[in-house]
């Protein structure tokens, strides 16, 4: 196990009707004026936005708002939000939604207190040294942004989809999580969220770091739980227990708990970011395609941890042939994704002829010559993984 620092100060308020506490919590954390950030009309139609506003009013917290955040969030809304934030003298960001909304709010929180272009943070030209506080009302379990210091934004001019990690400044001070708010999610969106959650765990799980049994078991237990609950929610979309477990899995998957003391990989996310940046597909769907291709590649090149995953998560019998075990586990994961209605190939994703050369040029520009840690991938390796996903 490697040395580590684990810092996770977010206050999670979980359960039915918890959104009505948002005003009191915002006041508790010193907010005078918040910016509510949201996406489409669902938070309006459901009455959630009105409940949030009423709670803020009752607590004496002023607010302004910005809607229209799209999936795979773009830089344009961040620039718009920064201007609004400064004009309205906001001191706390309050995203009401899923990962795209939260990530947009985090980028605004960092950019509002920075004299330059917020994109400087994403390309490594500047480091986040201060930011507005961020608080969350979560409606879509997937990205885990409600408990992480991460944000991912796409720059439309260059189609660069890049991430930023600044946990000291961008991890939410509190997150409200009511599983009932997820009842009305379409089945495909629920499935994409589950794939995203699983990918966050697997990026941490597939490691060469020895003697990490406790975090191995945390990863495996969380994966096993979410697979079980996914089957249940597929049949019973309004099952509170299933929705609650999936929502909490999303947080545990990405708040750092599963990755302590171990070298993480993150190659699959980088490979997928090129797909969703260029083709604007759902991130979770892209991950279902890429992760199974990545695992098939690793079955040949470094099968040990893939084989352990196959045995402990999907009950594949132990064998001396680790590659065979790894491929069997990958096949079971593909079967699960397909059952959930997810694609496991570019064709199923709706991309008949992916421009692999274009993706590789962008990938190399964004990430350099080598990718990941489980196996250091060259651009030739990355081409092969994209090819395996055809």
Predicted segments — roles?
Residues 1-29:
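N-terminal amphipathic/basic leader segments beginning at the initiator methionine
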Residues 19-22, 45-48, 75-76, 100-106, ...:
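Short glycine/serine/threonine-rich phosphate/pyrophosphate-binding segments
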Residues 44-116, 232-243:
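N-terminal small/polar loop signature for handling phosphorylated ligands or for N-terminal nucleophile
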Residues 113-211, 308:
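A glycine/threonine-rich phosphate-anchoring loop and its flanking beta-alpha core
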